[in-house]
Amino acid sequence: LDTSAACHMPDVLEMPYTPPLRGAKALKRFALTADTESSSAHCCRLSSYTCLAGDIIGDYEFDHEINIGDRLVFEDMAIYSMVKNNTFNGIPLPDIAVMKPDGNCKVIRHFGYEDFKSRL
């Protein structure tokens, strides 16, 4: 994923909270284990690409296989995403986007290196 619970979704770690994910069912927090048997072969734990071992968003069940390049839409996540974000481990700040009623997204603010540098 190109997101991080630690950097972009702090409430996921602090509450803890498993955000709704469009097209998937959120499972009980940390329900998946190596021995988990499920009625679906499409269960997975979604996490970040930081080095933080606990940077886990949640366990989810999909009705189809997810693949690299698929768009995953976490819902109900604007709570603290803009005011408590950070750039831990070099993770970029999240873009600000608006989703139109037809499902198309438009990025209205992208943060780059200068934004990172100005926060130091």
Where are each of the predicted segments found?
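Charged (often Lys/Glu-rich) extended helix/loop segments that serve as interaction or gating elements
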Residues: L1-L120
